[in-house]
């Protein structure tokens, strides 16, 4: 089963996977071995292949660690902070996500998110505005921008010294089932996860629950009890997430967990 999942992550055609299954386990494992050779499989300029032994420490400790990563740009070293939330964020949520991105990035912590519409993009934007370092984790190949409207944002992340990463091979297009896989990498690469607006059933809430399971610290923005995009955050706070009441409180709390904010390069 693990080998078949590897082939799916690497982008093998479903028909080819079925033919390999009929051919037997040795055929499947042989195909996986050949797929893992980036020199023959992914001659894509600017894309690096990290094997399991080369993964960042935050990922190697996960029980469901990715078998590899594809990387464009650089993966920042040191503690990072993830900022996630609704794709359909309110104007308030978007502005706050941007301010949080500015505050975290300006304090020297890399900002990790998913390059999605809404909160993700706003947090990345805020980080870049102050010269911070951003890291985007995609639910597609690292050469496939999703959504396409955020392509320029992704390029700016690379131009500013940040990175784009994915466990899915180059050329793989986004599909709904890929995003929960992506979310565990977002939380795994971060020491603290901040949730800005999240519905009760949302990818951001999945990321927060994964963060708790991974032993990460979780913070959430309290919101209007009658607003759908606030329900997830309010539930997280009820269950023990640290509420964000001011941006000064945000920095002080992160420093309590991670130590003094690093100097921004």
What spans do the regions from the language model cover?
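Glycine-biased, small-residue-rich flexible motifs in mid-sequence functional cores and linkers
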Residues: 45, 50-265
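Short, small/acidic-rich helices and loops at N termini and domain boundaries
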Residues: 1-54
